[in-house]
Amino acid sequence: MTTLAIDIGGTKLAAALIGADGQIRDRRELPTPASQTPQALRDALSALVSPLQAHAQRVAIASTGIIRDGSLLALNPHNLGGLLHFPLVKTLEQLTNLPTIAINDAQAAAWAEYQALDGDITDMVFITVSTGVGGGVVSGGKLRTGPGGLAGHIGHTLADPHGPACGCGRTGCVEAIASGRGIATAAQGELAGANAKTIFTRAGQGDEQAQQLIHRSARTLARLIADIKATTDCQCVVVGGSVGLAEGYLALVETYLAQEPAAFHVDLLAAHYRHDAGLLGAALLAQGEIL
């Protein structure tokens, strides 16, 4: 059976057909609508899936935000242009006439990445550092989503009580500092207005402010990982996302994690499925692995 998998992120929408063998084909991408209207997202999703839906028997969605009762509830509305609520499952069922499931994108990615690990690992945490910071937890070989879908939203744990305001309504969240948006927002002077990709490029060219912003992000993530180790006693942490997979970033995180007491050290791995983990994880879940 072929699954039409969809990944809804802060900057892009992706879709692909995934067979029972896990092979990804006919992958497509569109920019996430800047408009905060549900109709704009519906129209973009329609354009994304229309060339693929005739070849699938079901739909699986991995989306940023909290997924509850088939709807997207934005914990940080800024990540979707201000959109607060969207009926994901209902919309895709109407667009495709196919049975549909939905799950948080980082939770889906965690499940895909778990499948790629050695068989003796039963407890792991996945962290995505991209437009925002998200996560997924596998404990005892099972994906933990929580009764309300909130489990794994580790980007909204406290990093600095005097830090910047976060779009979730809290102050000093990891996401507000370590994410691509957080890196860009903190840029000043000639870097003001630059996005995270540009800041990474400038850091590689020796720009001191750009390097400091990236180190600040990596240091914040390392402290989060130490907290995760203390909370879950996980066997490894897998890091993905456009920032998490940027050249040299994970090595910086490892350097800062090594400065923590040994009890909080944990193996760090780059995401095996790179930017396709959310798509693949959603498809695996649709095959009945968990949901």
From Swiss-Prot:
Transmembrane segments: none
GO biological process entries: N-acetylneuraminate catabolic process
Residues involved in Zn(2+) binding: 156, 166, 168, 173
InterPro entries: ATPase_NBD, ManNAc_kinase_bac, ROK, ROK_cs
Domain of life: Bacteria
Enzyme's top EC category: transferase
A Pfam family this chain is assigned to: ROK
Subunit organization: Homodimer.
Protein name: N-acetylmannosamine kinase
